[in-house]
């Protein structure tokens, strides 16, 4: 994986850094695994705006991803590594020995032609999915379940990974991508390896138009609003807006919003560092 810095022949390309897409092997998705996406423009079923600063963008089709990897013991070969417009990570097309095809989140180092398999008897190799009870300590993992059979919910974005630190009783100690240390049931599954496209953080859009292609609209500064719209709005002339706050009045800098009565607090060994 690599990035390309474009020549500054136009103002929009002067600072632009794009993905090299070296790992991508095809630009044609599997037709049986795509579905249409209806653009809501940030409105709900009543037509009321529920999400600001979203709308427009290029038309996309959803790639149906297998986050559960339930075909235990059936080997699959990697047919292609593809770009997915709906996520930052690349995806891999698998062809199972029984003829079924699925998409999975591609791990860093996954190659076309490589064999992957899921289940308890799988080897701890890149792309294989195993229960946490069968993964060696210290292994870099991604696409982790929080509840058995739920499907991957943790470490799915480009370049993210977690690490299996210890096992005690029926729980595994996981160092999360955020830096948090958390307990997860040993019966939950995870995939070996870090998520692909680790250079995603180096990408620079270069111009406002490319951000619009992604469906993101311009964001209004709170200090430019009126007091009725935001706690930081109003004032005579240009003002600092006072203490930084969200639109709901919650302090924005370092204020902890997690409930002290959250039942899952008992599974957090160490909180992330802010």
Curated annotation (Swiss-Prot):
Listed Pfam families: Ribosomal_L2, Ribosomal_L2_C
One term of GO molecular function: transferase activity
Domain of life: Bacteria
Region annotation Disordered: where it falls in the sequence: 34-53, 216-274
GO biological-process terms attached to the record: cytoplasmic translation
InterPro entries listed in its UniProt record: NA-bd_OB-fold (IPR012340), Rib_uL2_dom2 (IPR014722), Ribosomal_uL2 (IPR002171), Ribosomal_uL2_bac/org-type (IPR005880), Ribosomal_uL2_C (IPR022669), Ribosomal_uL2_dom3 (IPR014726), Ribosomal_uL2_RNA-bd_dom (IPR022666), Translation_prot_SH3-like_sf (IPR008991)
Keywords: Ribonucleoprotein, Ribosomal protein, RNA-binding, rRNA-binding
SMART domains found in the cross-reference section: Ribosomal_L2, Ribosomal_L2_C
GO cellular component: large ribosomal subunit
Family the entry assigns: Belongs to the universal ribosomal protein uL2 family.
Subunit structure comment from the entry: Part of the 50S ribosomal subunit. Forms a bridge to the 30S subunit in the 70S ribosome.
Function: One of the primary rRNA binding proteins. Required for association of the 30S and 50S subunits to form the 70S ribosome, for tRNA binding and peptide bond formation. It has been suggested to have peptidyltransferase activity; this is somewhat controversial. Makes several contacts with the 16S rRNA in the 70S ribosome.
NCBIfam families from the UniProt entry: rplB_bact
Cited PANTHER family: LARGE RIBOSOMAL SUBUNIT PROTEIN UL2M, RIBOSOMAL PROTEIN L2
Record's protein name: Large ribosomal subunit protein uL2
Organism: Flavobacterium psychrophilum (strain ATCC 49511 / DSM 21280 / CIP 103535 / JIP02/86)
This protein's encoding gene: rplB
């Amino acid at each position: 994986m690599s990035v390309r810095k474009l020549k500054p022949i136009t103002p929009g390309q002067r600072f632009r850094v794009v993905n090299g897409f070296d790992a991508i092997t095809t630009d044609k998705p599997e037709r049986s695994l795509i579905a249409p996406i209806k653009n809501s423009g940030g409105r709900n079923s009543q037509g009321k705006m529920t999400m600001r600063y979203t709308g427009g963008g290029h038309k996309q089709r959803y790639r149906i991803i297998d986050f559960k990897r339930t075909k235990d013991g059936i080997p699959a070969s990697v047919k292609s590594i593809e770009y997915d417009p709906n996520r930052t990570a690349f995806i891999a097309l698998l062809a199972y020995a029984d003829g079924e095809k699925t998409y999975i989140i591609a791990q860093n180092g996954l190659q076309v032609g490589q064999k992957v398999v899921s289940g308890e008897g799988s080897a701890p190799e890149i792309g294989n999915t195993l229960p946490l009870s069968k993964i060696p300590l210290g292994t870099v993992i991604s696409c982790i379940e929080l509840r058995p059979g739920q499907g991957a919910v943790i470490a799915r974005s480009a370049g993210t990974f977690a690490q299996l630190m210890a096992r005690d009783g029926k729980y595994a100690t996981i160092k999360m991508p955020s830096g948090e240390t958390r307990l997860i049931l040993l019966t939950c599954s995870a995939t070996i390896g870090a998520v692909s496209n680790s250079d995603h953080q180096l990408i620079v859009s270069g111009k406002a138009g490319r951000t619009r292609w992604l469906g993101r609209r311009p964001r209004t500064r709170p200090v430019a609003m009126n007091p009725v719209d935001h706690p930081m709005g109003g004032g005579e002339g240009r003002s600092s807006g006072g203490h930084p706050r969200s639109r709901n009045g919650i302090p924005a800098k370092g204020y902890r919003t997690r409930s002290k009565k959250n039942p899952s607090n008992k599974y957090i060994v160490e909180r992330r560092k802010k």
